[in-house]
Amino acid sequence: GTEDGMKELKDRIRRDGKIKAGNVLKVDSFLNHQMDIKLFEAIGREFKRRFADAEVNKILTIEASGIGIAKKTETKNIAGEVYTTKVESFTHGRIYDIIVSKEFLGKGDKVLLIDDFLANGNALEGLAQIVKDSGAELVGAGIVIEKGFQVGGDMLRAKGIRVESLAIVDSMDEKTGTIVFRGDDSDE
């Protein structure tokens, strides 16, 4: 069924995710550095299924940290006007400049944001602002792992942004290594 792929994702996070001080969840072993192609395909299919009603024609992502869901292209020197925003990533602990060429994004585009993590929502907020500035329509955001105990998800949803997170971590304990996912007890 549709849940299988995401159960696999949660199992992988439980098995291979490392909890570090300061609410950091390391999933480099399968999300960032060593891409698990099967898992990525499952993730891609799930996003496609969830946003099937939305006629997405553009996908915007930030510093795809090795994420194969949205293919990363080499940065070219962009001629002409660009949209730009600075965002601070909680997950990666640094500030990014996001630059999108105006010829890439505009009226009539239906844009889906994709990111590996949603923590405090700064990165996605920056991307959402670019979409808004361009006159394109923001269809929503597809997140692989949302930290439900941080403010990002609630903030973005409160702004009316459709956020689809494949795994929502409600709590994680550095000492015991325990990760609790939303909906663990009940299937929503």
Predicted regions and their residues:
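Conserved PRPP/pyrophosphate-binding segment of the phosphoribosyltransferase/PRPP-pathway fold
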Residues: 42-91
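Short catalytic-loop micro-motif centered on adjacent basic/acidic residues
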Residues: 58-61, 113, 139-143
